[in-house]
Amino acid sequence: MKQNRRNFLGQIGLAGIGLSFSAALAGCYQRNRGPALNLYTWDTYVGKHTLADFEKASNSHVNISLFANNDELFAKLRDGNPGYDVIVPSNDFVERLHQAGSLLELDHARIPNMANIDARFLNPLFDPGRKVSVPYTWIVTGIGYRKSKVDGVPDSWKWVLDSDKYKGRIGLLAEASELFEIGAKYLGLPANTADVATLARIEAMLIKQKPNIAAFHDDNGQDLLLAGDVDLVIEYNGDIAQVMREDSDLAFVVPREGGILASDGLCIPKGAPNPDLAHQFINFLLDGHNSAHVSETIRYPTPNRAALALMPAEYRNNPVIFPPAAILAQCEYSHFQGQIIQSAYEQAMTRVRAS
């Protein structure tokens, strides 16, 4: 079954709720349902029974809202927290939100299951000491493709950024900073290169490529690929791994120039109605069994050692979920470089899409 938003919400028992939870966000307690936890996250990003299990364990109620990309998440919090308790930004947006003063410092004493996290993820440059974020997944961006529709393996970003061979059959990410970082990798530059000349060069390339693009997608590239709307799409490894279980004609590759690495984190925004329950939820997600259930559902690599030990070999040895070290060596993390650079990315992307 296609893992679109409505199917996924149905699987976790929330199909009738929809995307807007403004009524739930108006308060933090629901009559006869216990305190409410308001979660703002990506689509297909919890286990099928994760939320029900937490509700039972904590005598609480979870409201889930979905965002399509980090830009949407940041915009929602720019003028203050509208009522969320836990959010799930990517590493560069953890940095951006922290600099904006939007994140609550975590009380590690209330998150003892952080002991399950691999030490490699505990002191990143974007959040030294993990003061405001807890690692949830890590991610590699590459190209998802339909094997029967392309000639060989699309092992270069050229296939999607600088070629008309698959005109009208290509999907690109809509998130400005990441698309321009990928453009820099294709040009042989560090991903975070953002000088005026480089941004202009990437913008011109994308404008030239735009007639060949079927869609700029908001984290639903796997759905486009599965439905046959595109044959090549820039997407995250976990999303493509999800649909590869449903269609053996689909595959994923990290281009030889290297991809973009990311680490999504669990954060509590300032002004959270229920920070105590938020800490409890984060600790619940970091339990080995609970984290393993999430990983089995969403197919992203886990930074949780206890969860990894519980996962089957099919997951642990899957090169889409865990690309080989030689491939990862060519990949880079993106970094928030300040509002001036971020605005330059966004303005350039606006011009590309308007061209």
Model region roles, listed by residue range:
Residues A325-S355:
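Conserved C-terminal helix/tail region of periplasmic/extracytoplasmic solute-binding proteins
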Residues N7-G27:
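N-terminal export signals
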Residues I139, L199-K208, A214, M244-K270:
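Periplasmic-binding protein-like
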Residues G144-K149, K185-Y186, A262-P275, I282, ...:
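A bilobed periplasmic-binding-protein/Venus flytrap-type ligand-binding module shared by bacterial periplasmic
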